[in-house]
């Protein structure tokens, strides 16, 4: 090894000499770079990985474009300034620039050749300015542009030829202007456009030629205009379109076969319009549609076979309409639908086979109608339903076979109705049910066989009814019950044997009833109960409550005097307190005193 040293030493000296610059100047320290001078008052940064120069001039209160922007700049931020005018050839030396942000800069005028020299530009932001007009060929010098944002300006029209040269454009946003009409051929120079946003304008109609050249378009947003109707062949060339937004217009009619040719469409939003009727061929040709939103219209009825071609539809929104009835086979052909919303209609009559064919529906919203009585076996064939919403639907009674066939149901919402009677074993086939909500009804009695079959039920809400008593075996089938709310009823007694079968109970509320006494005999250690709420009853603080007094003092976590809570995600609101007072009503000597604050002497004779 030592024999190699004489050879390596001259080589090292030779390399060291070669590294000295001419004239004997010392070498640059590691980390020195040739950063171009940054224009005042901007900030510049050089990406260590790509060596791309970024120039940041945002919100500098500039009235003129900064001078001497380095010619190798790749990105230039000029947003939030006060330019007013963009002169011709303003960026003529920035041929390397690929990103230019001029949004929110008070721009009112852009001269025709303002973007001359920007041959490498990919992204241009001109949104949120005061632009009313752009001359034809304004973007002729930016032929590599991929995205162009012109939204939130004051355009009332767009000149034909404005987009000449933008054959590579993928994204164009003209939303939230004041556009009243568009030239027939305004988009004919954009053969590669993928996303077009025209939302929030004042367009009253669409011409047949308007979208003919946009054969690559995947997303079209026309929401928030004043469109009155959809004619045939408007979208016929958009065979690759996947999402179409027509919501928040004034559409009152759709021509038959209006969506023919749109074989790739997956999402169609027609909500918040004025549609009254749908026809058998309204949605003809939409073979790939997954989501159809028709909520908040004025639809009064649904004809059979209206949706027959939508074999891949997964979500159908029909809420907030005026539908009065559902006839047999209304939803035939919708074998893949998972979510069906019919809430906030005027439904009074649902035929027994109305839901036939909905083999995969998992969530069904029928709330806020006036159904009153559902026919027997109405949900026959809807075997995969997980959640059924029937709250606020004027229902007065539940029949024995109303929910027959719903073997997969997990959640059943029946709150805020007028239910006064439920036939025995009405829930007997709901073996997978986890949550049953019956609060805010008119139940005064629970049959001993009412909950037969609900062996997996975990949550039962019975608050705000008119219950006077509960018989011994009523809750016996509910072996897995976790949460039981019986608050705001008229219960005068609660026998130990009613609660004792509930061996998994964690939460029990009997607040605001008429209980005078309460036995904790069912709470033999080790018990599972974590919270017991008994406030708002007519407690007679005598020997019959000594057990409750001792338990509440021994287990204050189970019977807290209050619980503090804060609205989730909002730290600014004051905390809310839920109190669990055990206020004595009798005898007079203890009236007004909390049971837990009474002395041992009060119960010495027990």
Features from the language model and the residues they span:
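LRR N-terminal entry segment and analogous cap-like coil->beta motifs
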Residues: 49-99, 103-106
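Recurring C-terminal helix/loop segment of individual leucine-rich repeat
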Residues: 64-68, 88-92, 110-116, 136-140, ...
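Membrane-proximal C-terminal cap and juxtamembrane stalk of leucine-rich repeat ectodomains
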Residues: 1-2, 8-40, 44, 48-51, ...
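Consensus "Asn ladder" position of solenoid repeat domains
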Residues: 60, 81, 102-105, 126-129, ...
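Leucine-rich repeat
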Residues: 49, 63, 69-72, 84, 92-97, 108, 116-121, 132, ...
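Eukaryotic tandem repeat interaction scaffolds
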Residues: 296, 311, 320, 330, ...
């Amino acid at each position: 090894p030592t024999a190699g040293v004489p050879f390596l030493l001259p080589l090292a000296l030779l390399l060291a000499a070669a590294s000295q610059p001419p004239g004997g100047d010392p070498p640059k320290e590691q980390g020195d770079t040739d950063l171009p001078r940054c224009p005042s008052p901007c900030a510049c940064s050089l990406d260590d990985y790509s060596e791309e120069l970024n120039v940041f001039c945002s919100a500098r209160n500039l009235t003129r474009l900064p001078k001497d922007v380095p010619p190798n700049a790749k990105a230039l931020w000029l947003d939030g300034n006060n330019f007013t005018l963009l002169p011709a050839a303003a960026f003529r030396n920035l041929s390397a620039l690929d990103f230019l942000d001029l949004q929110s800069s008070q721009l009112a005028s852009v001269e025709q050749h303002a973007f001359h020299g920007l041959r490498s530009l990919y992204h241009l932001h001109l949104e949120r300015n005061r632009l009313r007009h752009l001359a034809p060929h304004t973007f002729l010098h930016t032929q590599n542009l991929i995205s162009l944002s012109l939204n939130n300006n004051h355009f009332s029209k767009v000149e034909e030829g404005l987009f000449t040269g933008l054959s590579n454009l993928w994204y164009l946003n003209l939303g939230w202007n004041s556009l009243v009409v568009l030239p027939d051929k305004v988009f004919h120079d954009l053969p590669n456009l993928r996303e077009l946003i025209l939302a929030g304008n004042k367009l009253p109609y669409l011409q047949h030629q308007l979208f003919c050249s946009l054969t690559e378009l995947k997303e079209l947003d026309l929401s928030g205009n004043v469109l009155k109707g959809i004619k045939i062949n408007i979208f016929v060339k958009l065979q690759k379109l996947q999402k179409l937004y027509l919501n928040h217009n004034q559409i009152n009619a759709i021509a038959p076969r209006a969506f023919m040719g749109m074989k790739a469409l997956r999402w169609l939003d027609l909500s918040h319009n004025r549609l009254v009727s749908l026809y058998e061929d309204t949605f003809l040709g939409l073979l790939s549609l997954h989501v159809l939103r028709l909520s908040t219209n004025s639809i009064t009825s649904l004809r059979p076979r209206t949706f027959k071609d939508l074999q891949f539809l997964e979500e159908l929104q029909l809420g907030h309409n005026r539908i009065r009835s559902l006839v047999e086979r209304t939803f035939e052909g919708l074998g893949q639908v998972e979510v069906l919303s019919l809430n906030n209609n005027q439904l009074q009559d649902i035929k027994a086979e109305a839901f036939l064919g909905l083999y995969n529906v998992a969530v069904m919203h029928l709330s806020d109608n006036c159904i009153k009585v559902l026919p027997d076996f109405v949900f026959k064939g809807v075997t995969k339903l997980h959640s059924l919403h029937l709250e606020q639907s004027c229902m007065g009674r539940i029949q024995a076979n109303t929910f027959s066939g719903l073997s997969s149901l997990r959640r059943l919402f029946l709150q805020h109705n007028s239910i006064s009677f439920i036939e025995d074993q009405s829930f007997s086939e709901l073996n997978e049910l986890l949550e049953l909500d019956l609060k805010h009804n008119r139940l005064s009695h629970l049959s001993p066989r009412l909950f037969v079959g609900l062996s997996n039920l975990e949550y039962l809400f019975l608050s705000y009814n008119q219950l006077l008593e509960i018989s011994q075996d009523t809750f016996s089938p509910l072996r897995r019950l976790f949460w039981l709310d019986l608050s705001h009823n008229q219960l005068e007694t609660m026998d130990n044997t009613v609660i004792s079968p509930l061996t998994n109970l964690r939460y029990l509320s009997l607040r605001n009833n008429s209980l005078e006494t309460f036995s904790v005999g069912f709470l033999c250690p080790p018990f599972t109960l974590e919270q017991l709420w008994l406030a708002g009853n007519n407690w007679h603080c005598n020997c019959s409550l000594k057990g409750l007094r001792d338990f509440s003092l021994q287990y204050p976590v189970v019977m807290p005097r209050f619980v503090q809570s804060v609205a989730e995600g909002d730290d600014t609101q004051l905390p809310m307190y839920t109190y669990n007072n055990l206020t004595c009503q009798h005898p007079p000597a203890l009236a007004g005193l909390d049971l837990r604050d009474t002395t041992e002497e009060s119960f010495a004779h027990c």
